[in-house]
């Protein structure tokens, strides 16, 4: 079975597909709660895998692939803890390559989702007022 998110995800893909099929075909199954929990755990693992790949590229200043992976985490796994982290790394990547409009839009989105988060506040301090102009 798939035990580490860093490794080949083929078994994880098969497992999550099986859980989703089970939930779709048997919505009132007594195994529903267990299947939902295991599917959620697998989603966290997939989010972690993509996030770590994005971090690999970000550390090497390969911003375009890093942005793609972070956007995938946000799009595919929005309910996982790594989604918030991916937003923060997107802000960091956009700032590094001076994509101010993308940085501002990402800050606006992450502030709506996590309004009282301190790290979000620090990462998006330049955009505390959504009407503020980006700094250069």
Question: Which residue ranges define each predicted feature?
Answer:
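Acidic, polar-rich low-complexity tracts and alpha-helical solenoid repeat scaffolds
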Residues: 1-136
